[in-house]
């Protein structure tokens, strides 16, 4: 790993990464709004911010001093999180310190393997690569392919694992044990409470990513509304 990669990974250790995303058509769907949200969560103690889309990545990068984890979503089915080398290059060029991409074993649209994608990206950019995985096997595959960080982002969304009501602790714990310090595991996906985040960390996660429960007021409002019915 490069010195840059080591520094970024060390800066995230034991911390909270906050995902600042709004979906098309939503009131908060604007790069400057997401940049303001990112500044707010940094003030609250986030060690990194995850942002979606080139405009958002660039805007967030200009507003925070913590690392920016960038993704580019194309659609919402199959491989859609930074699905090709072209997408990864663009996310890097937009200013991301960490490029998160699909780290599953599925075939990629540009015909490149995950290992080829990571190798080419790292040859061109001094960037950290996070693999968004859907299972333990995905995580081991992504580590072998050269990913610097292994995330549980896609657990429950690829058909390989059931969608748990909350974080997939089983995958988090298994990856930590199987990787045995070779790659940091980032717990992400359906972490909605501080207790859930704490449990993920206690299982050995390097850092925890929380999005909806912090930065998506429409969903949070719905949770309260439903509880009052």
UniProtKB/Swiss-Prot annotation:
It is an enzyme of class 5 (isomerase). Keywords: Carbohydrate metabolism, Isomerase. One of its GO terms (biological process) is N-acetylneuraminate catabolic process. Coiled coil: none annotated. It comes from the Bacteria. Pfam families: NanE (PF04131). SUPFAM superfamilies: Ribulose-phoshate binding barrel. Gene3D superfamilies: Aldolase class I. Pathway: Amino-sugar metabolism; N-acetylneuraminate degradation; D-fructose 6-phosphate from N-acetylneuraminate: step 3/5. It catalyses: an N-acyl-D-glucosamine 6-phosphate = an N-acyl-D-mannosamine 6-phosphate. GO terms for molecular function: N-acylglucosamine-6-phosphate 2-epimerase activity. GO terms for cellular component: cytosol. Its EC number is 5.1.3.9. HAMAP family: ManNAc6P_epimer. Converts N-acetylmannosamine-6-phosphate (ManNAc-6-P) to N-acetylglucosamine-6-phosphate (GlcNAc-6-P). NCBIfam families: PRK01130.1. Belongs to the NanE family. This is Putative N-acetylmannosamine-6-phosphate 2-epimerase.
């Amino acid at each position: 790993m490069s010195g840059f990669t080591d520094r970024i990974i060390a800066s995230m250790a034991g911390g909270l990464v906050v995902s600042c995303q709004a979906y098309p058509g939503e009131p908060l769907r604007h790069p400057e709004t997401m940049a303001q949200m990112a500044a707010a969560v940094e003030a609250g103690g986030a060690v990194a911010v995850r942002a979606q889309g080139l405009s958002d990545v660039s805007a967030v990068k200009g507003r925070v001093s913590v690392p920016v984890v960038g993704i580019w979503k194309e659609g919402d089915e199959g491989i859609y999180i930074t699905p090709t080398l072209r997408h990864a290059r663009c996310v890097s060029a937009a200013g991301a310190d960490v490029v998160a991409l699909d780290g599953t074993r599925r075939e990629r649209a540009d015909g490149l393997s995950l290992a080829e994608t990571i190798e080419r990206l790292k040859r061109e950019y001094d960037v950290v690569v996070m693999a968004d995985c859907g299972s333990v096997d995905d995580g081991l595959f992504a580590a072998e392919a050269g990913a610097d960080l292994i995330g549980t982002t896609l657990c429950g969304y690829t058909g390989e694992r059931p969608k748990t009501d909350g974080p997939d602790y089983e995958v988090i714990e298994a990856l930590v044990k199987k990787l045995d310090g070779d790659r940091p595991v980032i717990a992400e996906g359906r972490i909605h409470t501080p207790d859930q985040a704490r449990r993920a960390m206690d299982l050995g996660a390097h850092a925890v990513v929380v999005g909806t429960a912090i930065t998506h007021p429409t969903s949070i409002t719905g949770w309260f509304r439903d509880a009052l019915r």
